[in-house]
A protein has these predicted regions:
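Short linear interaction motif-like sites in intrinsically disordered regions of transcription factors
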Residues: 60-63, 100, 171
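Amphipathic, well-ordered alpha-helical segments in soluble domains
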Residues: 43-53, 57-60, 90, 97
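Extended, well-ordered alpha-helical segments in internal regulatory regions
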Residues: 90-108
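Hydrophobic/aromatic-rich structural module bridging two neighboring secondary-structure elements via a short loop
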Residues: 60-89
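Acidic, Ser/Thr/Gly/Pro-rich intrinsically disordered interaction regions
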Residues: 1-49, 53, 72-82, 106, ...
Length: 270
């Protein structure tokens, strides 16, 4: 499996050179932003790892070989489906982290009893951790009824371009199969994959009802397979790769570049 983009180009700088004289000192915004930027890339990397595993040929690592070719094919597909679902979870986590990445870059962490909390300047480690945890708790989806982003746009209008990017992305992404399948796996159950279902034995029985007036015959649900949420594993893996290449990476690249341009983080944070 080949991807178009190097995700590590999205990460914070691994090394920098700068003149100490006149260099901008880091503040909490810089630290929080770079921290979330790095965490986002780590989760993105995990998604890629499991995508690569969907094409593994190292099956002896996962189970002992069997003489039954049908059973062996089923094992391959079942494990590949687990790798796919794990990658699906990580990709969706990356999307959610992108909201936090934007939120913590803004010039306040949270409101306490209606008072704006200023997170500029340098903080003791314990205070900085507490502020970041507090900020993380405030993040919701960009279109949730009580989302913080409209308020952020009023308080920090310089961040409007970045906030609009995450809202526009979410409005499109939330209706895609990538998000719908993630929500199904997370909250509702496990999907059935057509490639695996084809290998299962046929149903034991079928129940049919005939309409005496029209003669129309209707099959009644009598097997658990009748009510499964089913789709193709191969097509889903391909769709996830295309989402990575053509949707997720370009969105994150633009978002990070936009925030960096607004925030101008200190070169001392890397």
């Amino acid at each position: 499996m080949e991807f178009k983009n190097d995700i590590f180009t999205l990460d914070k700088p691994s090394s920098v050179k700068f003149d100490l004289v006149g260099a901008k000192l880091p503040n909490s915004n810089d630290i929080f932003f770079r921290s979330k930027q790095h965490e986002l890339v780590e989760q993105y990397s995990a998604a890629r790892i499991f995508m690569y595993e969907t094409e593994t040929d190292d099956w002896n690592h996962w189970f002992n070989p069997v003489d039954d070719s049908t059973a062996e094919e089923a094992f391959h597909l079942i494990y590949r489906s687990h790798f796919y679902e794990t990658a699906l979870f990580y990709y969706n986590a990356v999307v959610d982290i992108s909201w936090t990445l934007c939120y913590v870059a803004v010039e306040f962490a949270c409101s306490k009893k209606g008072v704006r909390v200023n997170i500029t300047g340098m903080k003791p480690i314990e205070d900085a951790c507490e502020l970041l945890r507090s900020a993380e708790r405030n993040v919701t989806s960009p279109t949730a009824e009580e989302n913080p982003f409209e308020y952020l746009k009023m308080m920090c209008p310089e961040f409007i371009p970045a906030i609009d990017q995450i809202i526009d992305f979410w409005n499109t992404f939330s209706a895609t199969d990538v998000r719908k399948r993630y929500n199904f796996c997370k909250h509702k159950g496990r999907p059935a994959y057509s490639e695996i279902e084809k290998l299962r034995p046929g149903r034991l029985m079928g129940i049919y009802v005939e309409n005496k007036t029209s003669g129309e015959v209707t099959q009644i649900a009598s097997d658990i397979g009748d009510v499964k949420y089913e789709f193709s594993l191969e097509e889903a893996i391909q769709e996830l790769q295309e989402f990575d290449d053509n949707v997720l990476f370009p969105y994150l690249k633009k978002l990070i570049e936009t925030i960096e341009g607004i925030l101008d983080p200190s070169p001392m944070v890397f």
